[in-house]
Amino acid sequence: MLAPRLLAAIGNDPQRYGDDPNVLQCYAGTAPVRFQSGQIHRVKIRWACDKFLRHTVHLWANSFRRASVWGQTYYEQKRAQGMSHACALRCLGQRLLKIVFRMISDKKPYDAELHARNQTQHGSWVLALLNKNAPATPA
């Protein structure tokens, strides 16, 4: 149900967003707007974006967190940091959009094993939490 919405909103043209996943994330409204003046630093939700895509990413992130242990762990950690439900889903959506951007750029389908290897290689804090909370298996 969400795949057609994502395809319609994002498209499959690898040149559309250039070489930077941040362009797609800003377009989708998941990237926050940061501004500062003097000693004041603030972060706000991005309103200049495709609202249809932002809503689609919100629904996708919520579905993903329910279906994925990795997604649920990521979401729970963001909530523990004091983020609202919607903000935690936008953060998860940021990660998912980065993966989609790479899939579009490389013209390859999602590879869960490759994603797991990359997370291990880069020292993902989500994997560290998953490994810490995993039940010990008897030898």
Describe the residue ranges of each PLM region.
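Coiled-coil termination/hinge junctions
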Residues: 1-2
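Acidic, carboxylate-rich catalytic segments that either coordinate divalent cations
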Residues: 66-139
